[in-house]
Each structure stands twice: as C-alpha cells, then as structure tokens.
C-alpha cells in the first residue's frame, strides 16, 4: 500500500513587500508558526523577482501538484481545470486560458485592474454576459465556456499556446499596461478587450449593478494560459493538492497592514495551529510560505542534535523567513 502523502498547507502572501504590510511584519507574534519552523526543515526554495507573471504561490502550487516546469506566465491552469471538469478530453492538444470579468479602474494617468473577487457577480449575471460575449470571441477563433466560478470563463484557442499572461494576483492594483501581454500574438486580444469594453458598457446587467451600488463590469483579464499534455497531468488527479489558505490575500493586495497582521494572527491560531497539532501527533506535514519574490517549502526530515540545539536559540526565525519572501 502506498504511503499517505503529507498534509500540505500553502500560504500565499505570507510575506509582502508593500509598505504597510512590511511595517506590520515587525508587530507579528506567531507562536505556532515559530514552533512549526523550529520542528520542520527547509526542503526547497524558489526565489525570483517580483516582475514574474507567475507569482511564487502559483509556482509552488504547480510543483506540489506535480505539474512540469513551465515558462513564466504559462502555467496551464485553465487547461488543468478544463481537463478536470471534462471540457477537455484526454489527449486534447488545444491551449486554454482563464477569462475573468473585472472592473478596470480609470485614473487620471492610467487604468488599473480592480480585484475581480470584489465585483460581487452571481451565476445569472455571469451566464448573461457569457451569452453576449461568445459571438465576439468566436470571431477571433476563441471558444468560451462557463466555469464553476461566476465571473470566470474557460477559453479555448490556439492563440493561448505559448502566450505568457500575468496572474491576477500580480496585476491587481497596478496599471493594465504593466502586466498586459505584449507582442504581435496578443494584438487580437487587445482588440477584443476594447470591443468588450464598449459592449459591456451597454449591458442591462451593468445598469442593474449600478443601481445596486456595486462596481460595473467593464473588461476581462486573461491568465492561466497554456497547453496540458497527457504526460503533464498529475496521476491520480488531485492526490497531492495542498490546502491553499487565502486569508492574507485581500489585505495584502490592498496593502492594509493592520488587516494583514490581524489575518496572520487568526491564521496562526487556526490553520497553522492545526498543522502543528497534526505534526505533534506524528503526521507527515508540509508547509509552503509564499511572498512577492519567493517561496519556501518546509517538510518533516530527520534532524541531528546540533541542528535541534541551534533551533532552540533561533527564536526570530519566523519573522526572518517572512521578510525574506
């Protein structure tokens, strides 16, 4: 019988380089995380810069799932979802992408991406807009399908093969121009975005949203592009899926240092404490801490007496680890 896989907790935005969150880091008191880091061993480090389209937590999740290495911005999240839901058959060579409805926030000097998770779209609105959008996408050879998440569609087209796109978690709050795909291959997509902006402006759905006091949906963001080959699919599917804890995300993206620190305290008392309890009971556990620039994976490994003794005096380790992310 195969050995059980470790319980793996993956925490995006565990470290954050934005001013308020970075200042809040010094105030954190995370006793359960401190104890976990004393008892676990650093097994893997992934450090890049914060200009990568694929953020550290997405790269860490792809590794944990057993997906093969991909070029920056080309982790095939959409193709993986299409395969799991049955939209893509085994052996399907087509490329897929995630189309996420969003609010582009128009400023004096630039247009920034608002967080799609804040637009409060329901399934009926998502399906109504999908029906309107499909003919426009089809003109460019892109087939659109609904997903289980309102406001997010699966798109299938050859244009997505090798097209690097930025994760929403990279782009939120920043100028669209900073993270939009460039080059000749993306020109049809930029034109399609312009067409969709004009189309969405006239939709009854947005009139009703305005009456409710929620942000209008005025564009879409493309991400998760790529091809999933048969040999790339984890086997068995989902067997190595870590628990992805998103409690820190919203505060981190807003650079709300107080809320981020409060979320960390609650996380330490909740999911982190639970992982520590599992470890204490003898379970095989793993912890991935991810920030803007890097991710670190901690696992259960045999430790010699010297390393154990050193750990007893390394009481600032949690803050140091989070700061390094």
Give the label of every model feature segment.
Residues 2-24:
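N-terminal basic/disordered segments at the start of proteins
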Residues 16-19, 217-218, 226-230, 293-298:
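Flexible loop/turn segments at secondary-structure boundaries
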Residues 22-119, 123-126:
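An N-terminal, globular interaction/scaffold subdomain
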Residues 118-146, 202-219:
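Extended, Lys/Arg-enriched charged tracts that mediate electrostatic binding to polyanionic substrates
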Residues 121, 153-160:
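Internal, conserved structured core segments that host functional sites
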Residues 145-152, 221-222, 287-291:
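Acidic carboxylate-rich catalytic motifs and surrounding loops in phosphoryl-/glycosyl-chemistry enzymes
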Residues 148-150, 159-280:
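A contiguous, surface-oriented mixed alpha/beta subdomain in the mid-to-C-terminal portion of proteins
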Residues 257-325:
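C-terminal regions of proteins
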């Amino acid at each position: 019988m195969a050995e059980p896989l470790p319980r793996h907790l993956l925490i995006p935005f565990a470290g954050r380089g934005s001013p308020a969150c970075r200042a809040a880091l010094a105030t954190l008191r995370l006793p359960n995380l401190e104890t976990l880091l004393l008892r676990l061993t650093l097994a893997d480090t992934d450090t890049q810069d914060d200009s990568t389209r694929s953020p550290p937590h997405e790269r860490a999740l792809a590794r944990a799932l057993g997906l093969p290495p991909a070029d920056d911005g080309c982790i095939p999240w959409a193709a993986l979802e299409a395969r799991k839901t049955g939209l893509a058959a085994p052996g399907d060579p087509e490329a897929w992408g995630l189309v996420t409805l969003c609010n582009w926030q128009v400023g004096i000097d630039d247009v920034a991406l608002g967080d799609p998770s804040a637009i409060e779209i329901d399934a009926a609105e998502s399906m109504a807009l999908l029906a309107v959008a499909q003919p426009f996408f089809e003109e460019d050879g892109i087939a659109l399908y609904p997903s289980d998440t309102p406001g997010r569609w699966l798109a299938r087209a050859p244009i997505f093969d090798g097209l690097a796109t930025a994760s929403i978690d990279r782009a939120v709050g920043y100028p669209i121009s900073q993270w939009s795909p460039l080059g000749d291959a993306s020109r049809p997509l930029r034109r399609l975005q312009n067409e969709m902006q004009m189309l969405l402006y006239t939709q009854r759905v947005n009139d009703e949203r305005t009456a409710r006091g929620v942000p209008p949906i005025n564009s879409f963001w493309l991400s998760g592009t790529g091809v999933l080959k048969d040999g790339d699919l984890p086997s068995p599917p989902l067997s190595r899926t870590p628990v992805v804890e998103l409690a820190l995300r919203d505060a981190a993206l807003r650079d709300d240092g107080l809320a981020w620190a409060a979320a960390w305290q609650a996380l330490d008392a909740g999911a982190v404490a639970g992982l520590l309890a599992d470890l204490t009971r003898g379970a095989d556990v793993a912890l991935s801490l991810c920030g803007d620039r890097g991710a670190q994976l901690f696992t259960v490994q045999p430790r010699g007496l010297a390393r154990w003794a050193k750990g007893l005096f390394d009481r600032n380790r949690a803050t140091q680890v989070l700061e390094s992310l």
